[in-house]
Structures are given as C-alpha cells and as structure tokens.
C-alpha cells in the first residue's frame, strides 16, 4: 500500500495486498479502514461491519488497526477470528452487516497479507466502490473530519460461535439424500483459515477424514502445502488409500483435487466434469457456464459436445462472478481452482466445491480417477515476451493475418499485454503440439521484430 502522496492505485484484482510491515502497515491500514468506513456509512443500514482473517501472524496487527479505524468513524465491529473468505461473504449478509472485511493474502506466503471487502449483500466491491474508498484514502482532510467523539465512537466485540452458522450453510449445499459414509477423504487445510471448519463439515456428513496441515502457527500457512503444493496431498492419498483428496488454499476460496490414484486433477477437467454433472441433475441455469480466457480449448469443445455454452472472461474470480451475473448463470470457475456455485455462495468456496465433487462421485458410482477425467487437455504453449513498448496490437503489421491463420487451423490463441509488466503474453493451444509450437514461434518472431524486444 503506497503512501498518500503517491496516489497509486490501491486495489488489485482481489483487494489490497502486499508484504506485511512494509507495504501493509498499521498506519496505512488505519487510513484504508477509515476510508472504507466513510464509504460504507454513506448507505449504512445497520452500522455493523464484520471482520475475519486467516491464520497469518500479521493478521493481529492488521485486525487491530482496522478495528481502531472503523470504530473511530462510528462503526460497531464484529470480529470472528480465523474463517474462510467465503464464510466472511456469507456471514456479512447473514448477520445483516453493512460490509465484511477479510484479512488474507490467499495463497501467498505468510509474510504477505491483504484486505478484501464485501458489501452488504456479500458481493465483492465494484470498481466504482473501490475508487470511492481510494478517493478518501488520498484525502487526509476527509479522513480527519470523519472522526467521531464521545457517544458516537463505535464498539467492537469478538464472536467465536459463528463458525456453526457457516458449517450449517455449507452442509446445506450437499444433497440431503446422500451421505459420505464409506468414503475416505484426505483434506489438506494449508494451515489456513479452514483448519477447523473443513474437517468438521466432511466428518459430520459421514466421511472418514484424514486432515493434514491443520495446525497453523502463524508462519506455516501455504508453506509447501495446500492448493499451491498438492504433491504432499497426493502422497497422503496413496498412503491412506483414500477415495479422493482435497487441497484448500490459505483462505479456502480455492480447491485442488487429487484422485484415488494420486493424480492431481486438471482444473479445466474439474470444471468440465462439474458442469456436466450440474446439467445432468437439472441445476445448470441457462445451460451455460463461465470460464476464463486461460481455460483450455479442450474444455470448450467438451462442453460444446454436451450442448453446454461457454462464456469467457478475464482472469480473476471477480470477473467470473460478473460474467455469471451478466448472463444469469449459476456456475463458473477458473482452472486455478476458484469455482463459484452461486446457488450456495457469492464467491469461490473450496468447501462448497468439494461437496459438489463428492455428490458427483457418489451419484456416478465411479472412482474419482474415472469421474474427474472427462476429456484430454490439448497441448498449449505460453510465451511471456519482454517488450520495450506496448504498441497497440492492431498496429503490429501482419499480426491479424497470422491470428486468422491460427483460427482457420482450428487452434485457439490469446495475445495480450500484461497489466502489470512490460510483457506480451502469447498463448496457442490445439490438438497437434508441433503445429502449436510452430504457430507460437511465428507470433513471437513477428512481435519481436516490431516491438524492439
């Protein structure tokens, strides 16, 4: 988080994030919390804000700074301790709060941290709302003038029993005519926010649960475990001869699955299998789903073969959700493991996704290896080309003709500049790896000549 005089953009694709104690400091968090409080009070309904966090040690520092800021502008703060990001989204609406705040850097190492905001309805903030908060952040006069005194100063209280509400909510997403009895599941909690909740949900539904990485110490979140490092989970699945393994990330909004043979399930295969299952049980709204620009062409063709439409969007679960709302859809996801079932959650929820996978396995009668391997992923090649200038793509001579030739061959391409680096990302995918490789080289050679690489 930059200092006030730089006027840099605070919000990234998923809230505000940075190294704790260097970028995310007590003073910057107080300024951000005060700014958010001013913004939310403009349309206040209940004068309450919910604050949750993951298991990072720096969460204490940030939480206290937020409480100080929010109470200083008159808000009453409810602190719920370590809880998954989707739990904060759910509980914000369920407990009728004006807003919810999650302190987490998701899958990042322990020394990073971040802050995510949810509105009264449990949705992530729109860009206009983020810009409103930023406008206050960079205006010290508005921050000072918003401070309350006397009886107008807010209060704070810690509530530890809200975990039960979330557990009931999650269990209600699982079909009531099914049980997990007879299933052995290894659950990697990433030493993160779901270390208590995940094993309880699975065991209460009848599963034999082996929980791993469920002992957070403030420094071991995501450390060689969880969704970013599922190799350890794969070994445990084989050791315990489990039916399936689930790996969550630090704030439990992401899910990676390991099948009964120890294979890490490709994210696009998981999306495809779940989409088809939702259609088969009559729950896929408008017979279409959302995936990102990075999802493999094989997923698109698999869905098409089952008469399921696909709408693509930019990378980021916020964009997945926006596209779902635009087309009135109830299922979408990213190959990285952020999957949204909007019938049950308004953001990616690793536990909801895990329960839908389990329902699929039970009703199919197949092993996880067979049920979650619905098609083969096509070969792809991605090149990140460093450039000295970001010349408009339409002004690169001959590029469109090359792209048209790739489309004519039946392959898919993605050519776009990075939003944060001086890089041009070139992706091609198709059935024949040799042709894919040749087409990538063709694009790289052309762009290198015209972008002063």
Swiss-Prot record:
PROSITE patterns assigned to the protein according to its UniProt record, in alphabetical order: PGM_PMM
Pfam families xrefs: PGM_PMM_I, PGM_PMM_II, PGM_PMM_III, PGM_PMM_IV
Keywords: Isomerase, Magnesium, Metal-binding, Phosphoprotein
Any GO CC annotation of this UniProt entry: cytosol
Cofactor detail note: Binds 1 Mg(2+) ion per subunit.
Residues modified as Phosphoserine: 106
Signal peptide: none
GO molecular function: magnesium ion binding; phosphoglucosamine mutase activity; phosphomannomutase activity
Positions of Mg(2+) binding: 106, 249, 251, 253
Cofactor: Mg(2+)
Active site (UniProt): 106 (phosphoserine intermediate)
Summary of the function given for this chain in its UniProt record: Catalyzes the conversion of glucosamine-6-phosphate to glucosamine-1-phosphate.
Family stated for the protein in its record: Belongs to the phosphohexose mutase family.
Name the record gives this protein: Phosphoglucosamine mutase
